[in-house]
Curated annotation (Swiss-Prot):
Entry superkingdom: Eukaryota
The protein's name in its UniProt record: Pore-forming peptide amoebapore B
Physiological role: Forms pores in the cell membrane of host cells. Has antibacterial activity against M.luteus, no activity against E.coli. Implicated in the cytolytic activity of the parasite.
Pfam families: SapB_2
Keyword terms: Antibiotic, Antimicrobial, Disulfide bond, Signal
Subcellular location: Cytoplasmic granule
Length: 96
């Protein structure tokens, strides 16, 4: 019985770690995309992009959107404008 419980706990922990890695990678890719969008089209385009994206999002993307919106789009834009590394940005919004 203890072995089964141990295996279940391990499996849950592994799945959570894997999901965390997926969310972190998705966040880093999104930050890079937003960085390019910000450079080309400006902050208003970033706000519009995130609004459109998060309006349709589900799954991991929905989770990431919740974190971004909770953190604040303007704060995200400031970090990106200040050339903060995507990993650090994602850590600040609790996606990594």
């Amino acid at each position: 019985m203890r072995a089964i419980i141990f295996v279940l706990i391990f499996a849950i922990a592994f799945a959570a770690t894997r999901e965390g890695a997926i969310l972190c990678n998705l966040c880093k890719d999104t930050v890079k995309l937003v960085e390019n969008l910000l450079t080309v089209d400006g902050a208003q385009a970033v706000r519009q992009y995130i609004d459109n994206l998060c309006g349709k999002a589900s799954g991991f993307l929905g989770t990431l959107c919740e974190k971004i919106l909770s953190f604040g789009v303007d704060e995200l834009v400031k970090l990106i404008e200040n050339h903060v590394d995507p990993v650090v940005v994602c850590e600040k919004i609790h996606a990594c």
